[in-house]
Amino acid sequence: MSLFSAKSQAALNLFVHSNLTENNIVSKSEYNPSTGVRTFGYENVDGNWSIGLGGFGSIPLPGKKFSLRLGLNNSYARSVGFVGSERNNADNWTLREELTLAYRFGRLDTSLKGMWSHNKIVNSLGSAANNTATNDYGLHWDTQISLPLNLALESQLRYTSMNGYASGYNYDQTLVNIGLSYSFLKGKVATLRFKVYDLLGEQRNVYRNVSALAISSQETNIIGRYAMLHFIYKFNSFSGNASASDMKNVRRGPGGPPPSGRF
């Protein structure tokens, strides 16, 4: 569902999604202590389902130079499996919230975003020690400054703190990216950009796998500090004298909101 007020320039986009799996095939094992034999097999189970609710909203502040953006993405999922021969229900709660203060005036475009993500797992088997929770915090500061001679300077400063993971996977990191671009040709359709990524060399990529059988934290390899030279060309395939900006105005209307789901 999308709502937009032309008078206040406020926009709201809400979504909901759900999933239900019947007769899901899961593995199961049974151990016979008298013979020492463990038998493996499969069983069809019901009870796997999920639901999610979220949305995005933005509203300009008085003066139109500042704006606030709010993003929500919350979900619940239940997965059913067997630990040995005992059935386990794993309830997975996830909350993701973010708030952005953006400023745009003249040649300056900057935004400060705060983020919080909470994930809690509750298992029907085992003790309360098997019910774990993680909390991730983030602060992003993105800036772009348009300079004379068709130059533009951009930077991204992103701090992340991950807590509640397995030993060795809790960490704080600061990611810094800096770039300089030059636009040329008629209509500035071509851009050369030189950008340095992960200037401090601190980036890590950790993620969590959750199922009815286990919870695991894993880290994948990344490139690390590097630099790239980009060439960007914007194709204009509109007929007549129409331009991409003309088509954007038609799609959005006078002062309309960004496309659905993007703010």
Model-derived features: where do they sit?
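Exposed, low-structure sequence patches enriched in small/polar residues
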Residues: 2-263
